[in-house]
């Protein structure tokens, strides 16, 4: 069992927890984010755990296999593509994701990388915009934090 935690700061704030029983098991992602406008917001793991220049230093989506951007259910997607979270607009936004592509184990572990919450909806690579296949055209980075190992 490996557990990790991410404290998100910026215009969006919150805490997100990651838990994986074994290297073969899916990762459970839970938590809540505050400060989001009503609607969908892109939710991704970015390549670097560097927030020295705010969320912009975190680099592109974590993509060690050089795939195009896609939906969490797509075979062809960045490892860091976790889709969208749905905000009601006036209350904390719950995060509840189970993903079988990200991992907390080995060379492709997301520990030490950055979670980024975006201002707009992720079009899941299907929007036809020039950014659809790289970022999901999800807009500005409004909150982020580095994923760290948590006490079990």
Curated annotation (Swiss-Prot):
The record's EC number reads 1.15.1.1
Q: Where in the cell is it found?
A: Cytoplasm
The species this protein was found in: Drosophila pseudoobscura pseudoobscura (Fruit fly)
**Record keywords: Cell division included?**
no
What is the purpose of this protein? Destroys radicals which are normally produced within the cells and which are toxic to biological systems.
User: PROSITE patterns recorded for this chain?
Assistant: SOD_CU_ZN_1, SOD_CU_ZN_2
**GO CC annotations?**
cytoplasm
Keyword list (alphabetical) reads: Antioxidant, Copper, Cytoplasm, Metal-binding, Oxidoreductase, Zinc
UniProt xrefs under PANTHER family: SUPEROXIDE DISMUTASE CU-ZN -RELATED
Please report the name of this protein according to its UniProt entry. Superoxide dismutase [Cu-Zn]
Quick one: which gene encodes this? Answer: Sod1
